[in-house]
């Protein structure tokens, strides 16, 4: 209960300790709680766990057809392999056969047909993974091919949708376009992106008594896995416990996609009574799982001679793949963020959810927002080229105002707008205008190598657009030695969530972080959790943990006031000690006294985000609690004979409110920018004519490496600007907003290519801007520069 050998300190010594500040509370750059384990290889992931006795390994046989009717499945050849325990099809699933997260469309195993190359048709469980693989490939599947739809434009033209389209409308965009001083139209393809988490999808399931299961799953959404496992087994959720200590990366790819391996393992474990594990090899993982939604964009925009928008019509066609998954909300968010930082004037934005015979696309960092922002940044660049203006001048001319021109096309007022101040600060710190002139001079004297520069803003809304998800729970126990045990509903995927939440609890109790122990996210400790997504992890779970800690702290204050016969205002916690008027004692001493006085030292906490609502039928509301702002300035050099390029320098200024942990936040900004840059420059997904993903491994799908980093990367957080909303210690979310900073790299490449045409034409460079696309853009600029004005106009119109 206490250490009887400890030497008691005098009141003077305790007063000296009380006066000192915490070193690990909120606002300090505390290292990630698992940092040492990550770099030493000691961090335990699911595949590092000791295997259970008699554990089976599961391998799924995937469809090799994009669209086909299943005529027959013969699993008898599977049993010819020694060590095979069972082969299952959809007929063996005891409960619900569809694991669609919100709407049906994702059968656990194919039922009557297959909808994409990579869809699981059957699964084999055996003594080891290789035996299971060989046996699964021996099964005989007979198909009757059907005509697939593989192209998003074809799907749009055929109105081949997974869900109905949705419209945001403000004013009379058609009238504004018809009367605008200038008007341009264009199209843009925006590619998808593979999550490429280091740890592929994995689950391990242990059957328990009474039909229960313990599910160890690498998931961002433990409650959804719990729910779906219960449904496929036809049992109640209280029979299923999901345990999630850490993921080896997620980025949205483990929000819904983690359910399939967990459910397959659960079915096998149910049928055999044996523990079961399924780990996807990289190729199978990339074939089975959805990506970031590719988008096709059509724009029609009217503006004046300063570049200010008068009206805009946008068609945003998201390639959703073969089922709804989360596409309703993802395309909605693309529409919400199709303004980025700009007042659009009269606007019509149509969002289409196109169905193609590819894997069902899913959540990815930004959740549709980046695609909407890329569309409007293409428009800003196109206006600048049309008018012969600096693209930054056009962007600033369209910024949201503070007291006017400050309402979005979905009728949310942009409050606490920091765009102008942040842009001005970044202009100065990055020496934008001096470098712009220097680059013009360089390009005028360099026929082959061309430099580009772009400064782009970010305004990103924080909250789940599905309002009911904006809630979180936490559970805190304080033990009699003064140590603290914390569980919350969020999941740790390397982003530092556990560290931040522990800092919050340490700050409330005014103890150092080493007193706070966070263990695995577990559905039997914190139930009904929302996914760790939408940048909400710290906002929701930090606030829930703060609530739980404050409940216990209030009990302690009330007890101390009674015990020492003082007012509650006389009780103060600071640096691991408690001052009760003139008397000081250690935190653990107060805890022991409270325990003997039968004060509860445990509490749940709960939080729900206030103020938000969205009426989808009217397409208006306040879907976001607040906005996070940022800006990035990128400089690039392009070899116009090969299309190759190098990022020379990037300056970033980002708004995180009052940072909970500046070191972790800067790491998130750096990583977000690089991942966004990778999406828009090198991460190209390629399917063949039969719908098979060809870029299905690290040999063919390239993510940024060390050599792709800007040679000079400067990141700064906005200082002395707390979040005006009542968030956890007035911080702001930092998971997704920095991703959109990468748009500056794409715009800088286009700026360099545009210099070949004297900045008079907008290069046709779809995203990602691979060297091949950049080379074609360079050739286009050369042809336009050589053409007569009428010919150039005709050429542009044909693009």
What residues fall within each predicted segment?
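Flexible, low-hydrophobicity surface segments
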Residues: 1-165, 183-186, 271
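Extended active-site and interfacial segments that coordinate phosphate-rich ligands
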Residues: 33-37, 58, 137-144, 220, ...
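Thiamine diphosphate
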Residues: 248-273, 277-279, 497-505
């Amino acid at each position: 209960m206490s250490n009887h050998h400890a030497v008691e300190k005098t009141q003077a010594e305790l007063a000296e300790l009380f006066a000192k500040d915490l070193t690990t509370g909120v606002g300090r750059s505390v290292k990630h709680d698992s940092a040492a384990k990550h770099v030493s290889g000691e961090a335990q992931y699911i595949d590092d766990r000791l295997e259970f006795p008699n554990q089976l390994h599961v391998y799924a046989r995937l469809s090799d057809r994009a669209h086909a009717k299943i005529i027959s499945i013969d699993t008898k050849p599977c049993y010819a392999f020694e060590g095979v325990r069972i082969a299952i099809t959809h007929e063996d699933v005891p409960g619900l056969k569809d694991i669609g997260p919100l709407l049906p469309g994702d059968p656990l195993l194919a039922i009557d047909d297959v909808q994409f190359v990579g869809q699981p048709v059957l699964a084999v469980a055996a003594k080891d993974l290789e035996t299971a693989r060989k046996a699964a490939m021996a099964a005989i599947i007979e198909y009757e091919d059907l005509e697939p739809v593989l192209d998003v434009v074809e799907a749009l033209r055929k109105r081949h949708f997974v869900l109905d389209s949705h419209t945001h409308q403000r004013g009379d965009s058609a009238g504004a376009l018809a009367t605008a001083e200038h008007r341009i139209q264009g199209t843009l393809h925006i590619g998808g992106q593979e999550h490429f988490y280091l740890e592929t999808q994995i689950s391990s399931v242990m059957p328990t008594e009474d039909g229960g299961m313990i599910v160890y799953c690498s998931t961002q959404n433990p409650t959804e896995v719990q729910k779906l496992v219960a449904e496929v087994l036809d049992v109640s959720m209280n029979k299923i416990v999901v345990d999630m200590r850490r993921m080896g990366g997620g980025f949205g790819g483990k929000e819904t996609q983690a359910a399939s391996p967990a459910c397959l393992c659960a079915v096998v474990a149910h049928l055999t009574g044996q523990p079961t594990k399924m780990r996807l090899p990289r190729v199978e993982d990339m074939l089975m799982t959805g990506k970031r939604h590719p988008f096709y964009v059509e724009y029609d925009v009217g503006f004046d001679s300063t570049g200010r928008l008068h009206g805009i019509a946008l068609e945003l066609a998201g390639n959703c793949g073969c089922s709804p998954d989360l596409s309703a909300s993802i395309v909605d968010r693309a529409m919400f963020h199709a303004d980025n930082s700009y007042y659009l004037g009269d606007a019509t934005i149509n969002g289409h959810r196109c169905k193609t015979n590819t894997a069902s696309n899913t959540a990815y960092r930004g959740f549709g927002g980046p695609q909407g922002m890329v569309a409007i940044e293409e428009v800003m660049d196109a206006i600048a080229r049309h008018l012969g203006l600096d693209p930054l001048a056009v962007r600033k001319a369209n910024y949201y105002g503070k007291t006017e021109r400050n309402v979005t096309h979905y009728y949310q007022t942009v409050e606490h707008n920091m765009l102008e101040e942040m842009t001005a600060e970044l202009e100065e710190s990055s020496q934008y205008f001096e470098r712009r002139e220097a680059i013009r001079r360089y390009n005028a004297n360099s026929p082959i190598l061309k430099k580009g520069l772009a400064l782009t803003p970010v305004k990103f809304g924080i909250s789940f657009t599905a309002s009911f998800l904006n809630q979180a729970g936490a559970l805190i126990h304080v033990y009699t030695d003064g140590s603290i045990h914390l569980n919350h509903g969020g999941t740790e995927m390397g982003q530092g969530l556990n560290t931040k939440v522990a800092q919050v609890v340490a700050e409330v109790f005014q103890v150092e972080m080493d007193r706070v122990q966070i263990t695995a996210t577990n559905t039997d400790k914190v139930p009904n959790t929302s996914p760790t997504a939408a940048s909400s992890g710290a906002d929701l779970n930090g606030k829930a943990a703060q609530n739980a800690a404050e409940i216990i702290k209030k009990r302690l204050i009330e007890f101390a006031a009674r015990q020492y016969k003082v007012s509650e205002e006389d009780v103060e916690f600071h640096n691991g000690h408690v001052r009760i008027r003139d008397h000081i004692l250690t935190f653990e001493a107060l805890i022991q006294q409270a325990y003997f006085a039968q004060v509860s030292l445990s509490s749940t906490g709960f939080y729900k985000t206030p103020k938000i609502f969205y009426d989808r039928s009217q397409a208006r509301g306040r879907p976001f609690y607040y906005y996070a702002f940022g800006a990035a300035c990128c400089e690039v050099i392009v070899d116009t004979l090969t299309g190759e390029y190098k990022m020379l320098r990037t300056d970033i200024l980002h708004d995180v409110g009052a940072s909970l942990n500046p070191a972790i936040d800067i790491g998130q900004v750096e990583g977000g920018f690089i991942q966004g840059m990778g999406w828009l420059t090198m991460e190209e997904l390629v399917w063949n004519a039969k719908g098979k993903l060809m870029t299905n491994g690290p040999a063919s799908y390239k993510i940024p490496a060390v050599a792709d980093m800007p040679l000079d990367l400067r990141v700064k957080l906005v200082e002395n600007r707390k979040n005006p909303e009542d968030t956890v210690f007035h911080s702001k979310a930092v998971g997704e907003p920095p991703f959109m900073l990468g748009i500056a790299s794409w715009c800088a490449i286009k700026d360099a290519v545009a210099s070949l045409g004297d900045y008079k034409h907008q290069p046709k460079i779809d995203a990602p801007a691979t060297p091949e696309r950049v080379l074609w853009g360079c050739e286009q600029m050369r042809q336009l520069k050589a053409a007569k004005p009428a010919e150039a106009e005709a050429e542009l119109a044909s693009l």
